[in-house]
Each structure stands twice: as structure tokens, then as C-alpha cells.
Amino acid sequence: MDALQLLTWSLILYLFASLASLFLLGLDRLAIKLSSITSLVGGVIGIISEITQLHAGVTLVAHFATPFDFADLTLRMDSLSAFMVLVISLLVVVCSLYSLTYMREYEGKGAAAMGFFMNLFIASMVALLVMDNAFWFIVLFEMMSLSSWFLVIARQDKTSINAGMLYFFIAHAGSVLIMIAFLLMGRESGSLDFASFRTLSLSPGLASAVFLLAFFGFGAKAGMMPLHSWLPRAHPAAPSHASALMSGVMVKIGIFGILKVAMDLLAQTGLPLWWGILVMAIGAISALLGVLYALAEQDIKRLLAWSTVENVGIILLAVGVAMVGLSLHDPLLTVVGLLGALFHLLNHALFKGLLFLGAGAIISRLHTHDMEKMGALAKRMPWTAAACLIGCLAISALPPLNGFISEWYTWQSLFSLSRVEAVALQLAGPIAMVMLAVTGGLAVMCFVKMYGITFCGAPRSTHAEEAQEVPNTMIVAMLLLAALCVLIALSASWLAPKIMHIAHAFTDTPPVTVASGIALVPGTFHTRVTPSLLLLLLLAMPLLPGLYWLWCRSRRAAFRRTGDAWACGYSWENAMAPSGNGVMQPLRVVFSALFRLRQQLDPTLRLNKGLAHVTARAQSTEPFWDERVIRPIVSATQRLAKEIQHLQSGDFRLYCLYVVAALVVLLIAIAV
């Protein structure tokens, strides 16, 4: 049994779990167990399938005829699709284990229906990655969008429904762009099979039009700026294990689509240099603005969602370097760029999945998303705190964890641009490096804020004081992802050549010899630190703060006196502790043009409180893009809809007239 057949069994299990959940409506507890266990087994089979495929290193193709010539079912598993399915399967296994007990809070609230849409969502993502026909690709893409949309609106409250509608609009706008791109290629090739697209040699203008349509269409799904507005609204609205899958792997379908079109389907045409520069520019902007908006958030899941925009930007930055390398026929740039992109794609799926599961554990105990109402959870939820600490260190790209490794390779790809003689790239490279450096510093600040406000200090609410650790299956799921973050970092010298082999196979570039270790000199892979020495350094570095603390403690006087913290003559209250808003305030001032700040005035003055109630702080910071672009578009659409509504008179005869008029217009258009 080959890898494609194994994957078919995995898909069958997902579909079985989906349909079984549908038939178990009203039996939520049984539906949760059946759905979770079946999808877990499907994920394990998917992992085995893709490891087998990547080890074999061959491309598998299966073709099934249908009654429609344009919709023949063709499956193709190459190195990139196998890698992507492996990433999805890893996260599916962990999220399925997590959902066994997490979904109990949704009993009686449509848990069986959520199981149906969750497994349909997973199946559509996996099948889409191996689909080699444009018609079925779009069908599965729509199925993925619709099933995830139902997960977003699962709570059926006003916030989730509004988030779902915005997601629905942007997702389908992206689908239309992708559809037009495929139809343009289909018109030139006479077929909707991707195999025929690969043989096309399009004119530069048409190729650029196809690329731009596909780039912004898939970019909407990836959550890149300026098509990101749905992401910080939709991901927090979904159940936490669904948020982990949406943020960890669904947005990567957008990255996969960009790679597929630009570096596979249009490879025969050739890539203009400006394509790669455009992708780099949007990636750098997404990374920097994404982390800035993450810093401004109080909602823990919105913070993580904005961080996804940042990490998608980092991945696109590396993808842009790979595209530049392909356009310049530079194997080193191409392969190192793809190495950084794919490595970070894998790492982000792991640590972002971990953090969303951790956020779900906290919310299930405290029943709030507001970090200002948390605090001191490290004492009450120690396992969750430990797992989230590893996730925060990893996403901050601090050694010795996996985020550091993949961002290091992204840095290497940017350093390698110095070898290129093109003036535009010699300017773009340093600018991108500066933006990535600022992004990295802000990311550390962001997750210090998140961990400190959430897990440290004093409890800021009754729920925080009474919080308890989550059930064992949720803990094990989080610890598995935390262990993978550490394991991948320690095995980077073994894993990097495997990912480079995927890059070679996907781009059909000559092999680039890279010895074990991590390059330290820009543009070359000859001067290195040995893996054993690097591992020793990475393991020793985190111990230095602890050793310094022990040294300082030994120098303190033996006699100590403890008392309340000084609070300017007032009695100490937990609300006086540093807040997330206080951490962000300097950046809000420096980058005030990027935020819309609101100040609410309270006309009531209380003599005993002085001026304490004159002003109330804004509970949220709204990005300028939402205020100046998205909101006007939504308002204009609503006004247009009200005008069109006048056509809905309720007169059946008038409706028949509309049909006849539309038919006449179409006949005239065809005749002309």
C-alpha cells in the first residue's frame, strides 16, 4: 500500500467521523468521543503516510475519470504536498486528543454539529493539498472555507456572527480571484488539469495577471495584509482547538497556494524579479504591523491571531527570497529561502497551536478572554503555564527552541541577497532585515506581556483566584506540542537537509551542498559552528539568568523583613499591578498613526474618588486599516444592498420579467 492509498484511508476516517457526528445530533457526549478518536486515528495514519512518502522521495499520481471532461479527478502527491499534509496531521492528532475533554463545555450547545464541521474541515484541507485539477481544487477550497465558517459562528452570539460574516465575505472574494486565475490558465491550456497548466508558456502580461489574482486570492486565506481583517475576529470566535487548526494550518493553505501557482504552475513561463520583491514587501509589512497590533490587544486569542499575521509575514518574506532566487536562476537563494519558509511554516503550526490550546485551557477555567482579569495562573495551572512558557519562548524566536532555528534560516536567506548585483535587491535586503529585526524585538515584548500578565503577579479576578488545572488529556496535548518545539530545535541539523530536499524536489533546482550545522557568515555555508558545540551553547544560555539570580541571592543579608508594597500611602490592591495597557502605552504614542484610540468621558465626579472616574480607558485599540478601509467598504455595501432591495417587490410577474431581461442580455452578449 503506497502513501496515496494510506492517505485515502485517512480521508475516509475523517469523512466517517463527520457523518457519524451528524447522525448523533442530540447525543453530544458520544459524538465528541467518536469524532475525536476517529480523527485522531486518521491523523496518525496521515503522519505514517507522509513520512513514507517523504522517505521514498517520489511523486505519486492517481487519475479517476468522471462523466465530465473538465472535472476528471486527479490526485498528485509531491514533496511539498506531502510535507503540508504531515504538518496538518501532526496538529490534527494533538487537537483531537485535546477536544476529548475540551468539547464537554459545548455539550448541549451543538457539539455534534461542531464535530461534523470540524472533520469536514480537516478532510477538505487534506484532500485539497493532493488535488491536481482546478475544478476540484476550488470545490475543496470552498468546502474548507464554509466548514470553518460554521466553526467561527458556533457560539451564535453577535460577536461571532459578525466575525463570521466578515470572514465569509473575504474568503469568497479570495475564492473568486483564484477562480479567475485558474480560468485564465484553463482558457490557454484547454483543460483544467494542473498538468496542462505546467506546460503553458504565457505572455508576461497574462502571467503577471494570473500571479496577482492568485497571490491576493490565496493571500486572503493566509491572512496577509491588507486582506487580514477577518483573521483577528474569526480565530478568537471559534472553539480553541478549531482556532489552533485555523491559525496553525488553514492559513498555510494560502501559502501553499502561492507557492503552487508561482513556482509550479507558472514555472514554465518564468518568474519576473518584481514578483519576489512584491511578496517580500508585503511579507515584511505584515510581519511588522501584525506584531504591533498584537501588542495592543487585551484579548488573549486576538493577540495570538494578530501574531499569526506576523508569522505569515515572516513566511512570505522567505517565500519572496525563494522567488527572487528562482527568477535569477540562483539555486542557493531559492533553496535557502524555501528552507526558511517551510521550516517556519512547520514551527509556527506547532507553537501557535500550542498557544491557542493553552488559551483555550485558560478561557475554559476563567470564562474570559481578557488578560487583565487573569494573573497568578502559574500557581493554579502549573502544567498549562509550563507548556505556554515554552510556546512563548518558541514564538519569540529565542534559543534553544524551534522558532529561533527557522527565523535564523530566514535571516540567512536575507543575508544571501547581498550576493545579488541587482540594485533593487541590495536595497530591499537591508530594509527587510531591519523590519524583521524590529519585528523580532516587538515579538519578545508581546509575549513577555502575554505570559507576565496572564500567569504572573496577583490574581485580578475571582475566577483567577479559584482557577484549577485542566483535565489530563488537555495537558498531554499541550505537552506533546511543547515537546515537539524542543525536539525540532535539537534535531535541526538533521531536519534542515530533509526540508532542503523537499525544496530541491519542488523547484527542480540543482542540489546545494550544505554541511551539518548552521551558517554564521552571510552568503556562504563554509564557516560553521558544529552542532554539538551549538547545542551546548543553546542549552547553557537559559541557565545564565538562574545562576545570576542564585549569586545575587547569596549576597543578600540573612535578615529580611517583608511587608506590603509601597503604594504612595494607599493600601495595596491587585489592580495596581502593571497592566498590559501600561506595557503598550509607549508604543501607542510612538505609532499613534497606526491605531484609532478612543477616550470616553464620564461626567460623574465623585468627591471621595477625586478624578478617578473622569476618564475611562479604551477597552480596545482599532487598527487604522479597519477604520479607514474595511468600515467604508462595509458601509457602502450595506447602502448598495438597501438600494437593490427595492427590486424585491414581491410581485411574481416582475420577477419573471427580470429573468427574461437577463436572458436577453446574455443572448446579446454571446451574439456579439
Placement of each model-derived feature along the sequence:
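N-terminal signal-anchor/start-transfer transmembrane helix
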Residues: W9-L27, G219, G223, A287
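Hydrophobic alpha-helical transmembrane segments
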Residues: T74-S89, P204-F218, A349, A424-G440, ...
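Hydrophobic transmembrane alpha-helices and their helix-loop junctions in integral membrane proteins
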Residues: V94-F137, S147-E469
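Hydrophobic alpha-helical membrane-insertion segments
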Residues: I37-I51, H172-I180, C388-P400, A477-M500, ...
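Transmembrane helix-loop-helix hairpins at membrane boundaries of multipass inner-membrane proteins
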Residues: D2-T8, L19-F116, E188-S201, H501, ...
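Alpha-helical transmembrane segments
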Residues: S18-L22, M450, L543-R553, L666-A671
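Membrane-interfacial helical/loop segments at transmembrane boundaries in membrane proteins
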Residues: L60-D69, A195-T199, L332, Y409-V423, ...
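Aromatic-capped, Gly/Pro-kinked transmembrane alpha-helices
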Residues: L495-L539, L550-V672
